[in-house]
Each structure stands twice: as C-alpha cells, then as structure tokens.
Amino acid sequence: MRELKRTLACPSIYARAAALDMVESVSADATVRKEQWQLTGTVEVYGNKSRVAVEVSQPEENRSELHIKMLSPAANLSADGQNRVLLFLADGIEQLLENTFAQGNKEERIG
C-alpha cells in the first residue's frame, strides 16, 4: 500500500478543512470518520479512479501531519501513477492552505 506523509505549518483545523475541500473536488463519495478524523473517498485524478484515505493529526501547536494512503488504486495504475495521485492530492491541499494564509495576510489600500 502506497502512502505519503507531509508536515504542514498550520493547526490541524486548517489542514483538515483543506483536505476535505481537495478530496471533495475530485471525489463523489468522500466520507469522514470523526473519531480519528479519517477522510476516505474514491478520487478521480488524471482520469483514474482510486480509493484513498487522508488523515490529519496535530503533534505540536501550529504543525500538522498529513498522511495520505492509497487504499485501492485504479486498475492497471503503475506504482509511479499511484505516487502521482498521492502527490496531486498533497500538493493540492498545501496549495489551498497557502492561498488561505496569503489572503489572510493581504492588505488593501484604497485612495
């Protein structure tokens, strides 16, 4: 089973929201198990449908651990293809977080 782990510089509440947004954008059946906060769904990435699990934990304040597992890869999806799916999801989650925090730091001046 392929998996990817990534450390994110934010509290888990933000990482979980970004993970949910990202998975829902490429999945029709995303579900969250709230006890351990595990998100599962069948995602369609590059035309291939694979089942994944996403978990977010917070080992320290303002730091989250993102863990994405390939539960059931698309038929005939190579190991490299599976890695690309995991990277696509992790990069998308990280991009959503960057956009969120960049907008929060944005100043506007009128006049």
Labelled PLM ranges:
Residues 1-111:
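Ser/Thr-rich, low-complexity intrinsically disordered terminal regions
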